[in-house]
Amino acid sequence: MFSQNVKIPYSHIPSFYPQDSIFLNYLESFEQLKGFYELDYHDLNKLSESLGDYSLPANEREGLYQAIAPYNLKFNSSQRVKANLEALLEDNCYTVCTGQQCGTLTGPLYTLYKAMTAILLADLLNQKGTARFVPVFWAASEDHDFAEVNHVNFLNQYGDVEHLFLDIEGNGRSILDIDLGNGLSQLFNDLKAKWPKTDFTDQVFSLLQGGEGKLSDSFVHLMSSLFKDYVLVIVEPYLLRELSIPINQIAFEKDIDIHKELQQTTDNLSKIGYTPALYWDEGMNLFYYHNQARVKLYKENGDRFTSKNKDFSISVDELRDQIVRSPELFSHNVILRPIIQDTLFPNAVTVGGPGEISYFGQLKGVYKLFQRKMPMIYPRVSLTLFEKKFQKIQKRFHFSIEEIIDHDLEAKSQAMVDDFEKDQFVTDFADTMKKELERLTEEAEKKGKAVIDSLKPSIRKIDFEVDKIKDKYLKKVEETLGISKNQVERLKNGITPQLKPQERIFNYFYFMNFHGPSLLPEIMKQVDITDFTHQVLFYE
């Protein structure tokens, strides 16, 4: 399916990865940042020396197993899944965790790339034989930014990026609480009308239609189905509410300390020239559910918390009591989310993208408040799928891969327009021909009336044909230019849609419709998770 894997250093794609970004320097100048992280991801062999820091006692492993095993077996009851879940009970078993919001039809491609990286990394670590590693995907179903996940993006038949939306309202609710109703069926109908019918279309929609109900249920069903042969353990945060009570208590009591640690680390990053990725306000790090919406609470007068718009209020003592009595009323912000994961799981490695890697650089001190160590932060694989239709355009215009990925085609596109506007050849040709016809007419007139009269019809005809040639030439060149500009625009939209990495925009099932269910395993065969560059997979 793929003919080659071209690897581009992130530093060669400055439009996506600025030279002063934490992410880029984490990959290419780790020594500058190693003090902000616990482990060096470059040396997997040394991970075994630190595994004791990430272990869990038997009773905590048992509690974790009881919380997540029935849920996973509901989606996939194979022996391999059971074995992976039961492995979590063993003292020498650790996890490789990653996660993402529950997007519509799994959301953008990079969601799958995170899962792929976790699976492949767990396999790689298992081959070393020092411990057992299980890949875990955290389906962030308590997030409430519905606008981020309520749509599917793809390239339509005209080469434009198109968005189709779920026709339902989020109303501030968590994704966990959003019922799809008829919204998913309508989305399927819209996609069927927009996507071309291929040999794989029926398979695609057969898989998709098995994931109805809640948006989070649909997401987990699809992730479980896509990775059923790779025994990916999936967890939703609501499964861990009871287990999270002690962590929530610490978070509540140390809320001010958490902010102090964050501020100190952020200041230290700023001093050496980095812009922090993680921002926060003085609100509590625990969200509170009120009327089915997540509410951020702010301390008021020392003994009460209120919502930002003051329409809800609760005393400190009542809030402290509800953390224990009603854990379902609480969820975690971006600061606490990894703390929950890495306290409840024996998590030695977290797989993250540019955003996560950057904000983990601010969290090392926060981990210490919870008496945990930050796991190894391992960069997820970053990919562009380069289809044959785009390879043809690339070859025609002699674009380099880096020019395309870094969306540096504007100059070349403008050069084509400039060449057309400066094209004087046909105008000069026509002017020369007309001047020669004028000379011929003058010479014929000197020879007498009979000569000029005999030549006039031919001269007029030639003059007419010269104008016709000029018009045809200019029209065809302009038409060709238009086609060329359209092709370049298609290329840009297909590889860097909306001037962003392809993996952040397009949905996997759009590609599966063209290339079939073997696409995902083929990608997993081709990628190199130990090469920390952007990888471009070329279709055969």
Which functions belong to the PLM regions below?
Residues M1-Q4, L222, L226-I314, E318, ...:
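Long, compositionally biased intrinsically disordered regions
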Residues P18-Q79, L278, M284-N285, D463-V466, ...:
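Low-complexity, highly charged intrinsically disordered N-terminal segments
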Residues C93-N126:
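N-terminal catalytic cores of NTP/NDP-binding nucleotidyl/phosphoryl-transfer enzymes
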Residues P108-L109, A122-D145, P375:
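Glycine-rich phosphate/pyrophosphate-binding loops
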Residues L109-Y110, D145-V152, I245-I250:
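Short acidic, glycine/serine/threonine-rich loops at helix termini
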Residues A147-F154, L385-M416:
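A structural-propensity feature for long, helix-poor, extended segments
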Residues N153-N182:
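A glycine-rich helix N-cap at a beta->alpha junction
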Residues A277, E282-A348, P354-G365, M374, ...:
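A translation/RNA-centric and nucleic-acid-associated enzymatic feature enriched
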